[in-house]
Each structure stands twice: as C-alpha cells, then as structure tokens.
Amino acid sequence: MEKYENLGLVGEGSYGMVMKCRNKDSGRIVAIKKFLESDDDKMVKKIAMREIKLLKQLRHENLVNLLEVCKKKKRWYLVFEFVDHTILDDLKLFPNGLDYQVVQKYLFQIINGIGFCHSHNIIHRDIKPENILVSQSGVVKLCDFGFARTLAAPGEVYTDYVATRWYRAPELLVGDVKYGKAVDIWAIGCLVIEMLMGQPLFPGESDIDQLHHIMTCLGNLIPRHQELFYKNPVFAGVRLPEIKDIEAEPLESRYPKLPEVVISLAKKCLHIDPDKRPLCADLLHHDFFQMDGFAERFSQELQLKIEKDARNNSLPKKFQIRKKEKDDALGEERKTLVVQDTNADPKTKDSKVLKVKGSKIDVEKTEKGTRASNGSCLHDNGTSHKGLSSTSLRDCSNVTIDHPRNPGTAIPPLTHNLSAVAPGINAAMGTIPGVQNYRVDEKTKKYCNPFVKPSQPSPSGIYNMNVSASVSNCPLPRKSKHSPPLDLAVSMGARRVKLYLETESET
C-alpha cells in the first residue's frame, strides 16, 4: 500500500473505512476500503472475503470496478475506482425529488446493474441511495457488495438480517430465510418513489413499525409471512394489525401527482408477494422506459458516457498532474484586468476580460445586448471603430471565467486624453504621465500603425508602442462634456496644420 498517497477520509462504517488515495506511479485517484483487523473478527473476515470473491467475478459498467486487493498487518485493503458522488448526495441537494428524466436515467442503469448480478445468481441485498455511485459523466455504479451473496442451493438458507430497514422486503422483516432476487426488486420500488419525491417511502423506526408502514400502503402480508411472523421470537407477544381495504392508503392516493406509469412500475416492484415481483429484464421493458423511445436513445448516450469515463481513468500521470494543477489554479485568486467601454449604453455595453497568469494573457469577450457602434477602438477582427472611448480598469481576481477558445485582441481602447496613460498590467492604479506601452500580438500590430511610433526592438511577437500626442491620423470622438482636453488638443493641432500649410504655400 506504500504506492498510494492518502488524500483523506471518504466515510466509515461498522466494518472499516473508505479513503481517497492517489497512486504515486500513475497519478490515478482511487478509493481504498480498509477493513478492520479481519483475523480478530470472524464477521469482518466473512464480509471482506465475500466482497472480494464476488467483485472478482463481476465486471459491468454499472458496478464499481475492483482494481486491486492486498492484505497488510491482518487488514484487507480493496482498491476501487474513485467515484465521490452518490444518489443520496443528489437527494440532499434536491429534497423535493430529482428531475423525472434524471430518475429515468439513474433507474435504467440501476436495474441494468442488478440484472447483471442476478444473471450470475448473485443478489446484492443492500440496495439503497448511499450504495449507488454516480460518476461525473452520469454513469451509475452499484457498490458495497459486503452483504451480497450467491443464490442458495435447494435446501440452503440465508442469514435474515440484511439490507437497511427502509428498503427491506417483507420476507426479510418477518425472518424468512428462503428469499431470492425479489428482495432487490423490492428495493428498486422503494427507490423509484424516493428519487421522485425526495423522501423515503417506508421510513420505519423498527421492524414492526416498518411492517406497519408497508401494510398500511400495500395491504396484509401473505399467509406464509404471517405464519413466520408469529413464529419469530423477535415479535413474541406482538400481533400484526389487520388492514381493511377502507383503511389502506395505496400509492396512487398517497402520491396523486405522480404519473400513472410511475405508480404502475412501483406497484410491480412492491408486490407484497415476492413470487409475483417481476425480473429486471421485465422492468426494462416497462412503459416507464419504453415510452418515447427512451431506452433505445439512452442506451446510445450511455455508451458515450462510459467511453468518456474510461478515457478519464486511463490518463497518463503527467496529464493527470497537469490537469490537477489547472483545477487547483482555477480555485485560487487570479489577477484580471477588465477593459470596458464605460460611455456606452448599459444595454449595449461590450467588455473584454483579460486573465493574467505569468506571461500569458487570455482575453474573453463578454457581450450584453447588441454591440455599441462607438464602443472600443478595435473590433474583434481588428477593424477600427469611428470613435475612441475611455478605459476603465479594475481588479477582478474573484471573478470566475472560463478559458476562451479564440483569444481576441490584447490591446485596450485608447483614452480620450492621448497624453495620459492608463495603468499598466503590473502597475498600480492611477495615471502616469509620459509614454504608454501596450503589448500587442502579431495580429494587432498592423492596425495600430496610425497611432504609434516603434521604439526599441522587443522580443519576437511582442511590441512596445509609444503613443504620441499627434492626432493627424486618429479618428475623432464625438464631442462630450467629459473630454475638453481632447477638443482643445484637436483645435490646437488643426491651427498648427493650417499655419504650416499657409507657410508652405507662401514659400
């Protein structure tokens, strides 16, 4: 286990804990289940051995992938692919229930995964929201096979205490030891309602309370289960309530807003008689999945999601580290410059956001409404506008911005007062008298010629431009009460040109 770096605790339970780790060689993020000392606890050893055995033979896109198994100092360690999101997390985010289409996609995959287990004569026995992982691409994966087991041979019996109470079928609650795949189908029915409504269907506080919730909604237990109930010493001295039809509150009455197709699917899964519950293959052919061609359409979409996850999991170490550094950088404060036309109408304002990191500047253009005809000095394609606008610079280090695909021009619009200087990228806020330097790319250079005189040579691809006070070739702005210095400069410049021409003509 020395090749793994511990990144933190994901969760812990009765039999051990799960840690988030990184493989030092490949850089891959994994989840490691660390069991308690199994040599000292027979139950822990039994659960660990069962999970290892079953997961080694189960490989499916909707089951969590076991990568490695090792034992160190009496402890078993199971290394899994890392998926940090569960359906329980979704239910916490959306307490009123998930979107109908999301539930369709989740449930389709859950049934696929359970069906694969059943086809290998394995029952999960602990289906619940926290045991259903969801990848970033939306691929569902069943996990925690500690209670799973192969179907019994004729005459063999199971342990009776399995599954979290709220998702436990009636046969498990009364202590039947000859149950089968139907216990997983029951849990699916509980999940359908919970995912759509946001609340557990049967939130019993004890086994007898759980039975009461079930019987109030679905009616009396079958005779075999009633007999087992009264034989079970756990329920000694307790009588089952007799639920009359008028007292029952069926699903359609309890959830009148749910579509009929949802109630139909849930009722099939929640049949009080386990022998009458459908198989997973039958559920996938239910109208809930077949209406509007959902099953066929989503099967193709799911394949793309699975391929995407496979690519992400097989990234080389260097790429993963680079990607991690990039993600970390997005979380840190970055200094940015916002060059914005402050005189334009607010409804038609254009702005350019420049992200500065090291020597690189990314430019992202954001538009609000239509473009102003007299906005910034340069269009995206480099052509000049008819006017000049003032420049507003502010620190936007807290703004989250995506990387643009095609960075635009890196030169901000010129100020009204051409003798003044806007703050440089690394300079303090405020104006500095003298010469203004702009760093522009190769694409922009040719559009700046009317405004600038080249100074000392600069590194390849970057040019320093000295903006002089000459305005002979510069397009003039419209008159504004905020720009008397420019009007004065233009007037004086025009007089000098006129005097110069008169002198030339006389000579």
UniProtKB/Swiss-Prot annotation:
Molecular function as annotated in GO: ATP binding; cyclin-dependent protein serine/threonine kinase activity; protein serine kinase activity; protein serine/threonine kinase activity
Annotated keywords: ATP-binding, Cytoplasm, Kinase, Nucleotide-binding, Nucleus, Serine/threonine-protein kinase, Transferase
Keyword Signal: no
Motif [NKR]KIAxRE: positions: 45-51
Pfam families per the UniProt record, alphabetical: Pkinase (PF00069)
Record-linked InterPro entries: CDK, Kinase-like_dom_sf, Prot_kinase_dom, Protein_kinase_ATP_BS, Ser/Thr_kinase_AS
Subcellular location: Cytoplasm; Nucleus
Gene3D superfamilies reported in the protein's UniProt record: Phosphorylase Kinase, domain 1 (3.30.200.20), Transferase(Phosphotransferase) domain 1 (1.10.510.10)
Chief location bin: cytoplasm
Top EC class, one word: transferase
Residue ranges of domain Protein kinase in the record: 4-289
GO cellular component, one term: nucleus
Residue ranges of the region described as Disordered: 365-392
Catalytic site positions: 126 (proton acceptor)
EC identifiers of the protein: 2.7.11.22
Binding locations of ATP: 10-18, 33
Catalytic activity, as annotated: L-seryl-[protein] + ATP = O-phospho-L-seryl-[protein] + ADP + H(+); L-threonyl-[protein] + ATP = O-phospho-L-threonyl-[protein] + ADP + H(+)
UniProt entry tagged with the keyword Cytoplasm: yes
Record remark on domains: The [NKR]KIAxRE motif seems to be a cyclin-binding region.
PANTHER family the UniProt entry points to: CELL DIVISION PROTEIN KINASE, CYCLIN-DEPENDENT KINASE-LIKE 2
Family: Belongs to the protein kinase superfamily. CMGC Ser/Thr protein kinase family. CDC2/CDKX subfamily.
Name assigned to this protein: Cyclin-dependent kinase-like 2
Provenance organism: Rattus norvegicus
Lineage, broadest ranks: Eukaryota, Metazoa, Chordata, Craniata, Vertebrata
